[in-house]
Curated annotation (Swiss-Prot):
Coiled coil regions in record: 518-540
Region (Disordered) residue spans: 337-357, 373-396
Biological source species: Macaca fascicularis
InterPro entries, A to Z: Leu-rich_rpt, LRR_dom_sf
Keyword annotations: Coiled coil, Cytoplasm, Leucine-rich repeat, Nucleus, Repeat
Protein name: X-ray radiation resistance-associated protein 1
Ranges of the LRR repeats in the UniProt entry: 24-45, 49-70
Biased composition (Basic and acidic residues): 344-355
Main location: cytoplasm
Record gene name: XRRA1
Length: 587
């Protein structure tokens, strides 16, 4: 390279001419080379186009302060002299020709960059027939030489001198042995540095965050991006090619819409309808127009045939509702059809129709004969097992008595007492109990001691334990129905967002634990201040009553209005510490 160390003789260098070497070198990676001497920075500082320098996994302890060696005026003419140096950009990397001087003969040769590859060089002798003198136009004066200076003797930078690494933008010193912040500060002398990597060094191994001196001086003032952690490269997304042969082409058929089948509620309880009920129905049938009667007559035989074939249907599907005026006429038609079905001997009794009543949102068109036969057998068994009407009335009276004993706010919730949980329902369990169990297992590990006796240690004498009679636990008092309903309501609310903690334990925690639950600590302090203020107010009011002075009205607003959690306790304190009346004071 076109740089020399401190021990190089400056006088011998100034008497020679130099040419460009490695003019297009922009990236240099010297990883894992066991570099430890700071002079390697002085050797590389003359590379004028170097933009990226990587020195990872070496033994570098510090970055030295570099300053250009000042030579005579004739030799320091770096930017002037000749036509070719003016065409090249400022601070161009240059290299020297090597002259071999012997006592017998002097070989004149020149080191030039290759035409095919600019980063490589070739030696051209002057005696070679293809040697051209036009290459001498690239020869210029000596490039800058940098030396390492101690911090105490560091001078103010001269603007005429070339700075070290003028175009270096990326410097990586990861996996080295840098332990102090001062060892990295010379990076500020590199004018174009944008990014500095120094992770996995002793400087940042046991600390958190960027060191303060580097953050204030390099990052905030000079705008250098500091990287103290190893960046993980994102993984590329794997794209799976879609195969047309594996594509599902089946389509789900659309379900055709069918009119809903509505069941008319049956009000009659007797097996045989009375004559009083049949007479108004007959009158209604006579008043209806002839057109609708024909419609009903045409509808009835088809429905009766279908009812006989399919599970003895006791209903007739209603026609679509067209307007509000036709609603009443359709209701009367359905009522007449129900009564006609009841009077027909082919259909079952009212109790059978009650047992088969159910509400469906879909209409089944076809059913197998086996299912219909099973339904008929089940209906017959239910009719045989029906108890008499007397115990039903007793049960109803008992229910009325129990509901009358409960307060009014519990009416309608009596089913919760007799409700049985669904056996197929699995109660969801959160992750909190699992985490607590895991923490308990980690804090209390199971130690399996060896069964062999330890003869080296002091043996403890055997002391038999005293057997104590176990106390028979007293059964808890039986809860009333209101208490059971209150417990059910509390379980339904499930107040998981309320955290209970002793006030003294929260206030006397250490600083580290306070930072974890800072919100809880602030709320505890606020509650304590409110309690102290109310306590002082109560004490002052009691002292005024003792000494006969009238207590002043409270200046602070009611705390129960602003804080509902603490309001109940304050109301209780107000009622407990009320002012005594005149009759009490006289007595």
């Amino acid at each position: 390279l076109a740089v020399a160390e401190q021990e190089a003789s400056v006088t011998s260098l100034t008497s020679k001419r130099y040419i460009l070497r490695f003019p297009a070198l922009e990236t240099l990676m010297l990883d894992d080379n066991r570099l430890s001497n700071p002079s390697c920075f002085a050797s590389l500082a003359g590379l004028r186009r170097l933009k990226k320098l990587s020195l990872d996994e070496n033994r570098i302890i510090r970055i030295p302060y570099l300053q250009q060696v000042q030579l005579s005026d004739e030799s320091v003419d770096w930017n002037g002299g000749g036509g070719s140096p003016q065409k090249e950009p400022q601070f161009m990397l240059q290299s020297k020709p090597r002259m071999l001087e012997d006592s017998d003969e002097q070989l004149d040769y020149t080191v030039l960059p290759m035409k095919k590859d600019v980063d490589r060089t070739e030696v051209v002798f002057s005696s070679y027939p293809g040697f051209s003198t036009s290459e001498t136009t690239k020869i210029c004066s000596l490039p800058p030489i940098f030396e390492i200076l101690p911090v105490k003797s560091l001078k103010a930078r001269n603007q005429t001198l070339a700075p070290p690494f003028p175009e270096l933008r990326y410097l990586s010193l990861a996996y080295n042995k840098i332990a102090k912040e001062d060892a990295v500060l010379p990076v500020a002398l590199f004018p174009s540095l944008c990014e500095f990597v120094f992770h996995n060094n002793p400087l940042v191994a046991h600390t958190r965050g960027v060191p303060p001196l580097l953050k204030s001086f390099l990052q905030e003032r000079l705008g250098i991006h500091l990287i103290r952690r190893k960046t993980v490269k994102p993984k590329h997304h794997v794209l799976m090619s879609r195969k047309e042969s594996r594509k599902v082409k089946t389509e789900i058929p659309k379900v055709p819409k069918q009119p809903l089948v509505l069941h008319h509620p049956q009000v009659t309880t007797n097996k045989s309808p009375s004559k009083d009920m049949l007479e108004p129905e007959a009158e209604l049938a006579e008043d209806l127009p002839t057109t609708k009667s024909t419609f009903v007559e045409s509808e009835m035989p088809t429905e009766s045939l279908e009812g006989l074939s399919l599970s003895r249907r006791t209903f007739v599907p209603l026609p679509p509702i067209c307007s509000d005026s036709t609603v009443h006429s359709e209701e009367t038609l359905s009522h007449l059809s129900d009564t006609a079905v009841r009077l027909s001997p082919e259909h079952p009794s009212d109790e059978d129709s009650k047992s088969t009543e159910s509400i469906f949102l879909t209409q089944v068109s076809e059913l197998p004969s086996s299912i219909i036969h099973k339904d008929d057998l089940e209906l017959k068994e239910k009719d045989q097992k029906k108890p008499p009407t007397a115990p039903r009335e007793v049960k109803v009276t008992r229910r009325k008595l129990t509901t009358a004993s409960l307060p009014s706010k519990y009416h309608g919730y009596e089913e919760l007492l007799t409700a049985k949980p669904d056996p197929a329902f699995i109660e969801p369990k959160g992750i909190q109990k699992n985490a607590q169990a895991l923490q308990h297992m980690l804090k209390h590990p199971l130690l399996c001691h060896s069964s062999k006796p330890k003869l080296d240690t002091l043996q403890k004498p055997y002391v038999p334990k005293e057997k104590r009679a176990q106390r028979i636990p007293i059964p808890p008092p039986r809860k009333t129905r209101t208490q059971l309903l209150d417990d059910i309501f509390i379980r339904l609310r499930d107040p998981r967002n309320i955290t209970e903690a002793p006030l003294g334990a929260v206030l006397h925690r250490r600083t580290e634990r306070r930072l974890v639950n800072h919100k809880q600590y602030l709320e505890a302090k606020r509650l304590l201040k409110e309690f102290q203020a109310r306590y002082r107010q109560l004490v002052s009011g009691s002292l005024r009553t003792v000494f006969g002075t009238t207590p002043l009205p409270p200046a602070c607003p009611a705390l129960s209005e602003s804080q509902p959690k603490f309001g109940r306790f304050l109301e209780f304190m107000d009622e407990f510490c009320q002012e005594p009346t005149a009759s009490d004071s006289q007595g």
